[in-house]
Amino acid sequence: MKKLIIIANDTDACGKTTLTALLSGFVQRKGLRQTLVVTSQEQELPVDTVLLDAEDGFAPEELVDLVDHCGVVIVDAHTGGAEDFEKHFFRNRLDEALDEIECGVTVILPVCDDVAVLHQAQERARVWNKCAEVVVVRMPLLADEHQEYKGSPAQRYFSQLGAMELTLPAVKDCILDEIEAVDLDVPLALLQRQHLTRFVRTELLAWEVSACEILRNAEDLIIPANSRTSDTRDDAIFGKSLAF
């Protein structure tokens, strides 16, 4: 079995890249081969990525080959590109092609108490529900236009789908301030820890471990079935054992 994970919400600053960085670390500690995919040249991540351009389109076999040669492929669909990626995906019947190579699809939707974010997540769920497992992740973010997630039309729709719902903890304000002081944000800090002080690295690791413990609840939807283990791997930076 293989797994394609798509992180999608066409609203800006809703936690997509933070989830990408977290999931990448989660999968890596499982000892699985993975590929990170971006859908726009404007996305800049300080790690190796593959570009599948959502706006201009990409050869369908590119995605199939990536999945076929790698246990897990994580797609960070850029803001404004999720719908383009979806149209290209279904127009080329990639759901059928992935099914032929025994690849499961999981779509992860970041949400917060914001009108636009919730609306976009609901729209993405409507599209992907027919071929993918849906995981909704509540992010600790401020809203531009507040709408309580609990009891919202989006939350009711996710419940009807039977989507898994997770809530990630917030990063401490003092740690966010330290990260911003070196011109980073949370996802970049997760991927470029060498720029952080030891104290901030330690606090960020503690937050990451807590977040990954929550992600473990969705492990059946994230990790390919034949690769699920409870192995313990060493953290390369701190030399600490993280049992996932």
Regions found by a protein language model. Name each.
Residues 179-244:
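NTP-binding/hydrolysis catalytic cores, primarily Walker-type P-loop NTPases
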Residues 94-95, 99, 115-131:
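Conserved C-terminal guanine-recognition region of P-loop GTPase G domains, centered on the G4
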Residues 101-106, 130-133, 163:
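Short glycine-/polar-rich loops that comprise or flank the Walker A/P-loop
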Residues 2-57:
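Walker A/P-loop NTP-binding active-site region of P-loop NTPases
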Residues 71-90:
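Switch II (G3) loop of P-loop NTPases
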Residues 142-207:
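Beta-strand-loop-alpha "switch" segments that mediate conformational coupling across diverse proteins
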Residues 37-38, 74-75, 106-112, 135-140:
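Conserved beta-strand segments of the P-loop GTPase G domain that flank and frequently precede/overlap
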Residues 86-114:
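Inter-motif core of Ras-like GTPase G domains
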